[in-house]
From Swiss-Prot:
<feature type="binding site">
    <location>
        <position position="112"/>
    </location>
    <ligand>
        <name>chlorophyll b 2</name>
    </ligand>
</feature>
<feature type="binding site" description="axial binding residue">
    <location>
        <position position="107"/>
    </location>
    <ligand>
        <name>chlorophyll a 1</name>
    </ligand>
</feature>
<comment type="subunit">
    <text>The LHC complex consists of chlorophyll a-b binding proteins.</text>
</comment>
<keyword id="KW-0793">Thylakoid</keyword>
<keyword id="KW-0150">Chloroplast</keyword>
<keyword id="KW-0812">Transmembrane</keyword>
<keyword id="KW-0460">Magnesium</keyword>
<feature type="binding site">
    <location>
        <position position="144"/>
    </location>
    <ligand>
        <name>chlorophyll a 3</name>
    </ligand>
</feature>
<feature type="binding site">
    <location>
        <position position="168"/>
    </location>
    <ligand>
        <name>chlorophyll b 4</name>
    </ligand>
</feature>
<keyword id="KW-0602">Photosynthesis</keyword>
<keyword id="KW-0148">Chlorophyll</keyword>
<feature type="binding site" description="axial binding residue">
    <location>
        <position position="254"/>
    </location>
    <ligand>
        <name>chlorophyll a 6</name>
    </ligand>
</feature>
<feature type="binding site">
    <location>
        <position position="88"/>
    </location>
    <ligand>
        <name>chlorophyll a 1</name>
    </ligand>
</feature>
<keyword id="KW-1133">Transmembrane helix</keyword>
<keyword id="KW-0603">Photosystem I</keyword>
<feature type="binding site">
    <location>
        <position position="221"/>
    </location>
    <ligand>
        <name>chlorophyll a 5</name>
    </ligand>
</feature>
<dbReference type="GO" id="GO:0009535">
    <property type="term" value="C:chloroplast thylakoid membrane"/>
</dbReference>
Amino acid sequence: MASACASSTIAAVAFSSPSSQKNGSIVGATKASFLGGKRLRVSKFIAPVGSRSVAVSAVAADPDRPLWFPGSTPPEWLDGSLPGDFGFDPLGLGSDPESLKWNAQAELVHSRWAMLGAAGIFIPEFLTKIGVLNTPSWYTAGEQEYFTDTTTLFVIELVLIGWAEGRRWADIIKPGCVNTDPIFPNNKLTGTDVGYPGGLWFDPLGWGSGSPAKIKELRTKEIKNGRLAMLAVMGAWFQHIYTGTGPIDNLFAHLADPGHATIFAAFSPK
């Protein structure tokens, strides 16, 4: 679905060009309806170009979709087809179709890493706080002793993550080129989208095989939770810088003394 969404977005930008309007396409009406807040339906139009015909499709734009600011007009390149698209791009970072496609994948993978990072910060710290576990805090994890030195661990991580990220990058450049298992060639994935490999390892419950509306709903939830996780990880990092403790310790301290243990106390002279 992600590749299809990206394609539809690319088409939307391409169709809004002056050359497309001169060729008798329906883009003029499409753009006017979009800016005027009217619902558009997907339809096909055959426009003669020289001695051949070119089939184009109008991109569906739903005026009732949620926007980051109610009543605002979303940019042309954010037509609501991408998961988590609420029309927010004040810097125009997605105005170029290729940049939009790349940024969508970058946000997706950063969201997933942030969700893993947030779980690794909050859950062990909370369980240690209530006495279930006895683990070092996330901000001192690099100071602990492991089965080998940190340089060796870094090299191992670099090789493993580099291999995985290399295959992900190849799939972005040429969708579907990594759908065959490199170790067991008989294991192949079909009908997958860029960033959503599916299969037994990445979709064991088969949630990605539902209706398009359901799939987009799940992908939107993933992006929204990922964005929240990125903010949470950044917040935990700043909390440790200014307080010297983690978010769970800060929470318990605030609950014990809500009048004094606040965010303002970290910036008050002692």
